[in-house]
Structures are given as structure tokens and as C-alpha cells.
Curated annotation (Swiss-Prot):
NCBIfam families noted in UniProt: PRK05409.1 (NF003818)
Protein name as annotated: UPF0276 protein NGO_1946
InterPro entries assigned to the protein according to its UniProt record, in alphabetical order: MbnB/TglH/ChrH, Xyl_isomerase-like_sf
Positions in coiled-coil regions: none
Sequence similarity: Belongs to the UPF0276 family.
Superkingdom of the source species: Bacteria
Protein's organism: Neisseria gonorrhoeae (strain ATCC 700825 / FA 1090)
Amino acid sequence: MIQHAGLGYRRDLAEDFLSLSENSPICFIEAAPENWLKMGGRARKQFDRVAERLPLALHGLSMSLGGQAPLDTDLIDGIKEMMCRYDCTFFSDHLSYCHDGGHLYDLLPLPFTEEMVHHTARRIREVQDRLGCRIAVENTSYYLHSPLAEMNEVEFLNAVAREADCGIHLDVNNIYVNAVNHGLLSPEAFLENVDAGRVCYIHIAGHDAETPELLIDTHGAAVLPTVWDLLELAYTKLPTIPPTLLERDFNFPPFAELEAEVAKIADYQTRAGKEYRRAA
């Protein structure tokens, strides 16, 4: 069961995950299925051992939900098989596109238009039908705002989720990064207007500042106080407390520091005084 606070599984942290104490604040892990569908050897054996101990959430990198290229049915089938293998009940991916005749190796933004709402929602429904379960879509960080936009970011996110009848995977750091970079929608306005009943999962992470006006969502640093404040605010706006995961992709500190950040998430959840939501 995916609940409470978790930490993203990374191969560099395998030994730390294998030696977790019983009182660790880490209640679940998350992995990108693309990294594991064809992985074998020692790395896979370590992953399997950790996944036997902790519930697993899957978060995709390359579904290209808003793309124009046909959906990758082999990828979807591989994810479904992985969900069955690990008794995993949760999958999310980004509200973006990453294919254009081949992998672009980046998550590129979608124009916030009615046409794109219908296009993306249709593709999400196709994914859900093939997987046999509801998925969630994540608000992404983006660095170019389309002049074609007919609505703001949170209106677009809500519209897609409503038409696709899917969940919302809320990335608190991305809300902050986009607010600073574009100045179009304050974090407070985003959280006030997001479809709270659909928010079923949360990410929190660190970022780097290229300049005071340009933040990069790197997942390579500690979470900053302003982002912690937004997480606390998010919990006040939501009817229940979704599972919340700390993302850290590189530049790893001692594992105890990561556990301390996960423990801080758990503390914020407790202080919110609300029922915990299960991701499914």
C-alpha cells in the first residue's frame, strides 16, 4: 500500500535501502519503469530485494502523453507486466511530450489549449484502458511558455485530468520553479485552484538557481524552505494527505540526510491532522 512518505529508488542508494532500520521514515519507494524493464544482474536482484520489503510506485519518463507520435504499446505492456510482478497499484507520468520521430530525452511542454486538452486526455484514456487501471498525470517544470496558451497551467492540468478521468500527481517543486521562471501563476494560486479531489500523489525535490529569475528542476539538492512551505500549504488545501515522495537523482548526501528529509515530510503529514490517502 502506497501511503505516508517515501524516497525514490536509485541504484547508487541500493545498499542503503537494503540496510534500512525498522524505524526508518521511508514507507515506500518509487522507480521509473523504463530503467528496469530490461535490467538484470546484481542491480535487478538488489532492486527486487528492496521491492519485497517496501511498496513500489511507478513513475514513467517516456509515455509522451501529449505527443503526436503513436503511443508505445510495447512500453505500456511492459509497465503492466511490471505492475503485476511487483503487485504495484500506482503509475504516473508527466503531462508533456518526449517523442518526435524518436526519443528527445527531455520532457517538453504542451501548449495550454482546448485542442491539446482533448488530444492528451484521449491518449491518457488509451493508456488507462490498456493498463486496466487509473493513472495520474504530473505537472512538469517547463522553460518555454507557448504563445498559443488559452488557459493557465493549473486550468490545463485540471481540464486534462477531468476529461481523462485520471488522478493528479502534484509536484510541489515544479509549481515553485514555474512560478519563479514565468511569473504567470503564483504557487498559492496554483494550490488554491488545483482540483484537490484528484490529487493522489505528491513529489517534493530540490532545484538549482542559474540566476534569481531562472530555476532548474534538477533533483540534485536539498529541498529549500520555500518549497517546504508550499508542501505544508498543499496539505491544508487537500481533503486528505496523499503519499508524498522525496526525489533525489544525483549528488547524493549521506543517506541519513535523505532520511531526515523524508522524516520531515512525515512530520508535516502528521501535523496536517487529516486522513491519509492511499495511492491506487
